[in-house]
């Protein structure tokens, strides 16, 4: 089921782990599974499906008290406003910043040491290269240096065309067209068609 593909999350599993894994619903769509659930009385028809592992605000799980910090414009270093903790924000976020500017602003970096949220224009969110570390070479035998692959930098991505290269500690990607808000700490997953070739943790993007 392409709409429910979980390969982005499973890409960190090794071949040894996958060899002991069974996906009994792998050949079925979510709609087909839901129909069986309804027939068995496990779900009622029309019931909303769950999208998250936690129904509340994820910041509740951090058990951290709010702490005032600055919202900084990247280009000038000017303070545009204040926030209650950098952990309330995500890279690429546009809504809910609570500041006014001549054009839309996006979160482009989070400085945990200074408790600062760095913002910039849409152009500042675009990157053409990234470095990923801690690689998991799922399809290493089929990897070709410099070949054009599809890469996902978030689970909801359709995949972006890029060239992939090995590095001493991982791999680098050069995107054919700029991508938006490649976030350090998130996974970068490289595909050849629908097959995962490798996965790594984004170290930086520019």
Locations of the language-model features?
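Nucleotide-activated chemistry modules centered on ATP-dependent adenylation/adenylyltransferase
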Residues: 1-196, 201-206
């Amino acid at each position: 089921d392409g709409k429910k593909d979980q390969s982005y999350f499973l890409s960190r599993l090794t071949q040894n782990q996958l060899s002991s894994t069974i996906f009994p619903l792998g050949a079925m769509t979510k709609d087909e599974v839901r129909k069986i659930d309804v027939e068995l009385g496990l779900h009622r028809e029309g019931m909303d499906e769950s999208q998250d592992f936690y129904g509340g605000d994820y910041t509740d799980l951090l058990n951290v008290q709010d702490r005032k910090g600055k919202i900084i414009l990247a280009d000038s270093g000017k303070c545009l406003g204040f926030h209650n903790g950098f952990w309330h924000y995500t890279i690429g976020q546009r809504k809910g910043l609570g500041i006014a500017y001549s054009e839309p602003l996006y979160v482009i970096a989070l400085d945990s040491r200074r408790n600062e949220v760095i913002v910039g224009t849409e152009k500042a969110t675009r990157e053409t290269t990234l470095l990923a570390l801690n690689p998991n070479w799922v399809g290493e035998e089929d990897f070709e240096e410099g070949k054009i692959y599809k890469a996902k930098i978030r689970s909801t991505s359709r995949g972006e065309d890029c060239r992939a290269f090995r590095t001493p500690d991982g791999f680098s990607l050069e995107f054919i067209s700029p991508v938006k808000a490649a976030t350090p700490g998130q996974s970068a997953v490289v595909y050849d068609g629908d097959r995962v070739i490798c996965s790594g943790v984004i170290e930086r993007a520019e």
